A protein has these predicted regions:
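Short, surface-exposed, polar/charged, turn-prone segments marking secondary-structure boundaries
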Residues: 18-24, 46-50, 81, 147, ...
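An amphipathic alpha-helix signature
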Residues: 26, 30-34, 76, 80, ...
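Conserved AAA+ ATPase small/helical "lid" subdomain
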Residues: 44-101
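Canonical AAA+ ATPase core
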Residues: 1-69, 109-114
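C-terminal engagement/docking regions of AAA+ P-loop ATPases
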Residues: 77, 86-166
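Hydrophobic aliphatic residues
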Residues: 11, 33-37, 83, 129, ...
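Residue-level detector of secondary-structure boundary/capping sites
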Residues: 6, 70, 144-148
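Alpha-helix boundary/capping and short turn/kink residues
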Residues: 23-26, 71-72, 118-119, 163
Length: 166
């Protein structure tokens, strides 16, 4: 569901990720319903239960650490080639732009940092493809009516672009 007014492609491209979030499991959904329905008015959930887990400085430091993760030229080229392949794939009517490649590398750096590495790998880039590119490409109408998804086509693109070795 896109909401009342879908965003234009130029605005969608400015979002770093599109993460798909599913419904909660039955037990958690029941807990939510009970918590909210037991209160008169409002959401029924107390903001007082929220605890700070990091400071703004922590976030800035993490961003700086992620930016410092090394991205060697062959892996950056791989990210660029993946994005360029979205523009050439027959099932995709609108491919990703340069921001998509930049975002692939940035998210790959974050993945590497979270795994304790100071460098990105082609696997980090592959892992980033779906959340980074799924909102940046559009399927051709002929493919969209077949029930295939953007994720299906992005996975097909990944299979066609050779990853660097070594």
């Amino acid at each position: 569901y896109e909401g009342t007014y879908p965003l234009p492609e130029a605005q969608l491209d400015r979002f770093l990720l599109k993460v798909l979030i599913d419904y909660p499991d039955t037990q958690f959904e029941a807990w939510i319903v009970k918590a909210v329905a037991s209160k008169a008015g409002g959401s029924g959930l107390s903001a007082g239960d929220v605890q700070q887990v990091c400071t703004p400085e922590d976030i800035l430091n993490a961003q700086a650490e992620a930016a410092a993760v090394q991205a060697v030229e062959p892996v950056v080229d791989y990210a660029v080639n993946l994005v360029r392949a979205t523009r050439q794939h027959s099932a995709i009517s609108l491919g990703a732009g340069t921001r998509g490649a930049i975002s692939l590398v940035r998210v790959a750096k974050s993945y590497a940092l979270l795994e304790g590495r100071g460098y990105i790998t082609p696997s980090d880039v592959k892992r980033a493809v779906l959340p980074v590119l799924r909102h940046r490409v559009q399927l051709s109408p002929e493919i969209a009516i077949t029930g295939q998804t953007v994720d299906d086509m992005l996975n097909a693109v990944v299979r066609t672009v050779e990853a660097p070795r070594g």
